[in-house]
Amino acid sequence: FNWNRQCADCHSTNVQVGLAKGGYETRFDAHNVACEACHGAGLSHTNDTSKPYADVACAPCHSRRSQIAEGFQPPNQLLDYYVPAPTVGPLYFDDGQIRDEVFVYGSFLQSRMHMAGVTCSDCHAPHSARLQSSGDALCLRCHNESPPINFKDALGDFDTSLHHMHPVTPIECIDCHMPKRTYMQIDDRHDHSLRVPRPDLSIQYGTPNACSNCHDQGDEWAMQQIIQYHGSRR
């Protein structure tokens, strides 16, 4: 465990560790995350600013992976430079929820949002990593009764207690759909698979569910509450 192999690739720009010479002779273009870390060198990035590369720019540092080659820059193929960790134990729970520190990209790949074409920058400002909107306003930009034309499946009235089942206690979308785990006592990571709570899977496999993060009546009780509100099939 050292800076050259564990830290430098994501905290510097165009890192060349120099292992081919039998030791460390680390070189880099910038000792921080500069423009070229995501956009590539010089003029080349201005010739293609299309959106499909958005997640590719984020994935190398926001995923649990092993590096197999140096010099990655979009639009290069991610898998030519990195081997992502598989979404299995002990890094993930049996249903795919994050368990260990996996830096969220692996969970996002499991989501319906990813399958529908949502990218990191739809929710996160790429140059600050801040959310594009705060609280539920972020989700309700698409999940409303007049969704963007490219996300028609988001149609619905979700900002109501008939959906979230909590008429009195205020909750946010992420409380149910992006439960968090805390690493190193200070680092909160929200599961980006954006799944619905499944107490039934908790009963079957011992996996966590968002309901039981707040309610202490048990997984069987939580499952019955969901059936009562939404029916046995959704």
Where are these regions (language model features)?
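Primarily the internal scaffold of c-type cytochrome electron-transfer domains
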Residues: 1, 14-234
